[in-house]
A protein has these predicted regions:
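Patatin-like phospholipase
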Residues: 2-99, 107-351
Length: 351
């Protein structure tokens, strides 16, 4: 079945379901179209963790702009370059939200961790438990989300997360996931996550791609990647509910990209896999239309000066990439583009 099915297409789809709001109560990138090997750890010239981490200081930032991170799987390594550049520049935002890989970038930005912005992606390339087709056939998912989200973020683990800084942030945070039994997009905020465990299970749910990864239960309800929701992978609906109409949207696809519709055999696979969740099936089928509509809306808002779109000039990797050298290339390319665009971003924020 896997040989007939293109993960990049199944996971790149979403339905116009209602947005459920839970007091600030997240991914569905398309994954790879071919197997890729995990890199040799010996070739990895980075430390396992950074014992000298200090949160990046805040020096300035707008009070009326929401920062929105698109989903995109490992393509988020490219946009992580922008996360680092903005942190190094001392920027902060009153509202930050994301879906799937956008959830990872959201959390690293709010925790102001310049080291983890890179390592959250590079660290997976040499972790034998992170995923791959071997993980998929054993039922753990192409990306082993249980390991990635629940067993790497503690202080003594491979990619420690600065929970103290994150949880103390005055920023409004929104992470979105798709609830499979009701067809709702649910957004969670800091008020829903009093512990790091509460955050991690929600980040995991936000990033659990249909077909390629198991559903994740949160408070007894089944969730998958939030990118199958009504916007196709952009938390702009959550930003609007919170009163923000000026947006910096960080995208993982280049200018001109549009999602193609699903093929008939892909739809049949979804229907066989999820007979108990018709809302999920329809959401995945509808995602190309929803995604394309959102992109067109954002481009229109950009023409009015209400939105800044950071788009990769060229995306060098697929969303399921696990090769160290490819991830480094993507991150460095994103870093270089972000440094070139920072003056334009700063001008937009000040306008």
């Amino acid at each position: 079945m896997a040989s007939r099915y293109s993960p990049d297409r199944s996971a790149d789809m979403g339905r116009e379901s209602p947005v459920r709001w839970r007091h600030g109560t997240h991914r569905l990138p398309g994954v790879i179209s071919r197997p890729v090997p995990v890199s040799d750890p010996v070739q990895r010239p980075v430390p396992v963790s950074d014992p000298n981490h200090r949160p990046a200081p805040v020096t300035h930032g707008p009070d009326d702009v929401a920062l929105v991170f698109e989903s995109g799987g490992m393509r988020g390594a490219y946009t992580a370059g922008l996360v680092r550049v903005m942190l190094e520049a001392g920027l902060s935002f009153p509202w930050v939200g994301g879906i799937s890989a956008g959830c990872t970038n959201t959390c690293n930005f709010v925790s102001r961790d310049t080291w983890r912005t890179r390592e959250a992606y590079l660290g997976l390339t040499t972790d034998p438990q992170a995923g791959g087709w071997g993980s998929f056939v054993t039922g753990k998912g192409y990306f082993n989300s249980e390991h990635i989200y629940l067993h790497t973020s503690a202080p003594d683990e491979s990619i420690p997360f600065d929970w103290e800084t994150f949880s103390a942030s005055p920023t409004t945070v929104r992470l979105g996931a798709f609830r499979c039994d009701t067809g709702e997009e649910v957004y969670w905020g800091l008020e829903d996550m009093p512990t790091m465990a509460d955050l991690l299970v929600r980040a995991r749910a936000s990033s659990s791609m249909p077909v390629l990864m198991p559903m994740v239960e949160v408070d007894g309800a089944p969730y998958v990647d939030g990118a199958v929701g009504p916007t196709g992978g952009f938390a702009i609906d959550a930003a609007r509910v919170d009163g923000y109409d000026k947006l910096l949207v960080v995208m993982t696809r280049p200018e001109g990209y549009r999602k193609p519709p699903m093929r008939r055999h892909e739809i049949e696979i979804l229907q066989r896999l999820y007979p108990r969740y018709p809302a999920l099936v329809q959401a995945v089928i509808d995602r190309p239309e929803n995604y394309n509509r959102t992109v067109e809306e954002l481009e229109h808002l950009r023409s009015q000066g209400r939105v800044y779109l950071f788009r990769p000039e060229r995306m060098p990797i697929a969303n399921g990439e696990l090769r160290y050298d490819r991830i480094v290339t993507a991150f460095e390319a994103g870093l270089a583009q972000a440094r070139r665009e920072l003056p334009a971003i700063e001008a937009f924020l000040a306008s």
